C-alpha cells in the first residue's frame, strides 16, 4: 500500500484546490487562494503559509496506479519518491505543524488495510491525537528522505505492531505516541522504525527485506546523537535511548538471544554516563515512558536471574510512581506492579545464591524477605488509575484476566526459585491448574503477545504426560496465531528441562539452561 493512500479521503463532497494555503489544507477546509493572506486565515488571525512554486504533486498517473494496486513490491523501490500529502497537512513543512493547543489527526489513526502473515490484524488503533512532549516540541520532518516502500514499512510498524502491544482497550499506546513524532525529525529513530518495519512486515525469511533492515539499523546507529556528541543534552539522550529500546524490542520480537542484549547494554552504559537511572525522571514524559520499557526488559531477561537487575527495583519504582505515566500505555501497563514484584524475586534469588544457606541468620533473612514478597503478591491489585478508567470493570475483561494470570505466575515463580518447590508438589500443581485456566482464556485474545513469561513458568511445572501434551498444544495454538516473540525459544528451553526432569520431582533453574545454550533470552515479547 502506498504511503499516501492512508491520507486521501475516500469521498469528496466538493472539490478542493491543491494550491490552497497550508493552514486551510491542514484543517481540510476550502481555501479562496487569495494572496498573500487568504480569507480564512485573515479572519482567524493566522499567518498564511503557501507551498513553494514547483513543489506541487506530480506523476498523477503513477500515484493513481499505485493506489489502485494497493501495494508496491519490495523489489520495485522508487528511489526518486517525492513525499506529498494532498488535501491534508503538509508534514514536510515544519511551520505548518500545529503548536501546543492545536491538534491534528495522527496518520496512524486512519483506517488501513495491511495484510501480513506475521502479525494479527484484528485490532487497530483508534483515533488519537499526537501528544505534546516538551523536549521534542519543534519537529522538522525527515520523511522526504524515504521512498514509498520505506514509508510503508514505517507505517506498518505503527499500524500493526503498536495495537498488539496495547493491553487496555482504547488506551493510547506509547509506541506511536512517542516514536512517530520523534521519527519526523530524528534520523536515528526514523531509520530504526523503518528497519523494524521491514522485519515485522516481511519476516526473517525474506532475505531482501532482512538485508534492507540491516542497512537501516546501521544508518540508525551511525546517526545516533550519542555517536555525534560527547556531552548529550537531555533531548539527545532521550532520542538515543528511544532508538536503543526500539532496536531491543525488534530483536526480542524475533526471538533473538544475542543482539538485543548488546543494544540493551549500550543503553545502560549511556544512562550511567548521564548520571544513572533516576535522570530519566528529569526527562519529562518521554524519559519516563522509556524508563518503564527499560525496566520491563531488564526484569524479564534470563541473565537478570544470574546477575540481578541492572538497577535496583526501588529505583524503578521511584520512576514508575509518576502520575503522568497514566496518560499513555507502556508495555506492561496494568501488570506493572507484578512485573516489579518479579524483579524483587529475582534480586532475592541472586542474594540467596551468593550467600548460600549455611548461615542461619542469612537463611532467616531470606525467608522473611520471601514472606514480605508473598504479602505484596496477595495484596497486589490493578493500578488505581486503570480501575478508575472503567477499563477493568468487568470480571471477564481480558486485561483483568491477564492481571490474574501474572499474579498467579508471580506466586509460582516465588515458590519455584526461592522455596525450591518441585513441579510435582501439591501447591505448585494447584497453582498450575489455576494458571492454565487463565492462559486458555487468553490464547486467542488480543493479549496473547503477553504470554511468553507465563507460558515459560507453566511449561517448567508441567509434570505429567497429559500436562505436557496440553502445554505443547497451547504452544502450537499461539505459534499459529502469533509468530513473533520469544515463545519458540521458550518451547526449546521447556523441552530441555523435561528431558532433565522427566518425573517433575526436582526443581531446575530455567535460566541456567538458557546460559548453557549460550543465550540471553528475554520473555518481554
UniProtKB/Swiss-Prot annotation:
GO cellular component: cytosol; nucleus
GO biological process: positive regulation of transcription by RNA polymerase II
Record's subcellular location: Cytoplasm; Nucleus
Species this chain originates from: Schizosaccharomyces pombe (strain 972 / ATCC 24843)
UniProt name for this protein: Uncharacterized transcriptional regulatory protein C965.10
Chief location of this protein within or outside the cell: cytoplasm
Keyword Transcription applies: yes
SMART domains tied to this protein: GAL4
Record feature DNA-binding region, as residue ranges: 21-48
Entry keywords, A to Z: Cytoplasm, DNA-binding, Metal-binding, Nucleus, Transcription, Transcription regulation, Zinc
PANTHER family hit by this protein: TRANSCRIPTIONAL ACTIVATOR PROTEIN UGA3
InterPro entries: Fun_TF (IPR021858), Zn2-C6_fun-type_DNA-bd_sf (IPR036864), Zn2Cys6_DnaBD (IPR001138)
Alphabetized GO MF terms: DNA-binding transcription factor activity; DNA-binding transcription factor activity, RNA polymerase II-specific; RNA polymerase II cis-regulatory region sequence-specific DNA binding; transcription cis-regulatory region binding; zinc ion binding
Alphabetical list of PROSITE patterns matching this protein: ZN2_CY6_FUNGAL_1 (PS00463), ZN2_CY6_FUNGAL_2 (PS50048)
